[in-house]
A protein has these predicted regions:
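Acidic, surface-exposed loops and disordered segments
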Residues: 1-213
Length: 213
């Protein structure tokens, strides 16, 4: 596949809007999501593909102002403290082994991919509905496990903050850049190769993580 470097700060205008316009915002309004909107987000996740249609994902929803939300929010790393303002804090959970009534348990090598596909569907649907959906890996796993009662063979993938967009001006200055800063991605020719991977060309740029997500 031949590509040009393009503009790593700008997606192709022809991309579907749910992909093109998605970003990891951090400002939330306090208003709860209507039940039909909330249901639609998880229905989008439900229809994601998975290996053998195993659907190893689950979602644990906690609502701001409840003990469950407080317990899960306590797992957040300090850099993600802004997520406590989200009306919903969701733990994405995945079953990491195949369970079959007539066979011994076997590790599911594709479980995290399946969970990622389902979570990606949720994020895309949220973007289409004007909902902020921000997935985070910055949390204490032990605290999160205890908060939602997860035990092996289940694992927590990411936490997702969900809610309506809020006022960026109300954010602390050090957090506001996450909301308003540029989105930066590697150019296509650093990601897509014909026939063989070139390790030198595949190395990430030094500034690949700069800007918003």
């Amino acid at each position: 596949m031949r590509t040009d470097r393009g503009d790593p700060d700008r997606p192709d205008d022809a991309l579907t809007p749910a992909v093109r316009d998605r970003r990891s915002r951090v400002a939330f309004a306090p208003d709860p999501l209507p039940a039909d909107v909330e249901r639609r987000l998880f229905d989008a996740a439900r229809w994601a593909p998975s290996g053998g249609n195993g659907q190893p994902w689950r979602f644990v929803v906690t609502r701001r102002g409840t003990p469950g939300h407080d317990a899960l929010a306590a797992s957040l790393r300090p850099g993600n403290a802004w997520a406590t303002a989200a009306p919903l804090l969701v733990a994405t959970v995945v079953r990491t082994v195949h369970v079959h009534p007539e066979k011994p348990p076997k590790r599911n090598r594709h479980a995290l991919l399946d969970l990622g596909l389902a979570t990606g569907n949720l994020l895309a649907q949220a973007t289409a509905d004007g909902v902020v959906a921000h997935a985070m890996g910055g949390f204490d796993r032990d605290v999160a496990f205890d908060a939602i009662g997860v035990r092996a063979p289940w694992d927590v993938g990411v936490l997702v903050a969900l809610g309506w967009p809020g006022d960026p001006d109300a954010l602390p200055e050090e957090v506001r850049a996450k909301e308003t800063g540029p989105r930066v991605r590697l150019p296509l020719d650093a990601l897509v190769f014909e026939d063989r991977l070139d390790p030198a060309e595949a190395a990430p740029d030094d500034d690949a993580e700069a800007g918003g997500a």
